[in-house]
């Protein structure tokens, strides 16, 4: 919890009987920071990876991205486009509306769904992007269909 001046309120500022009632020792995330940073940092990290490995956005046939909420869907595409990774809408594959937010498992399920769809062709490139919101870290992988 924060004080009026935005500084964090210490557990020691609460009466001891409030410690359990208010879950003061539970780890919590300030989700307002997600809105401000997660998409931008992810786009910057992916751009750096593309540059380092001399990969071009037009080489991607599919982009699979884990998002925890549809709230992030358009924003993610926009932030990627802002750094020159303007993947056409038809290349994006999401399964959030079908399976819900299943966290780290979502990218594996989406990959399996795409594999079983019959759409993939030998040599196609599939980009996987997964954020870890606690530290604003992104993991990305580039797969080639065999």
Regions found by a protein language model. Name each.
Residues 26, 33, 95-101, 135, ...:
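Residue-level preference for alpha-helix termini and adjacent loops
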Residues 66-71, 100, 104, 132-136:
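Gly/Ser/Thr-rich loops at beta-strand to alpha-helix junctions
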Residues 79, 83, 99, 113-117, ...:
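Hydrophobic alpha-helical segments
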Residues 1-95:
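Hydrophobic pocket-lining "lid/loop/helix" segments that shape and contact the acyl-thioester
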Residues 1, 106-146:
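Conserved beta-strand-centric core segments of catalytic alpha/beta enzyme folds
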Residues 90-106, 129-130:
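Cysteine-centered functional microenvironments
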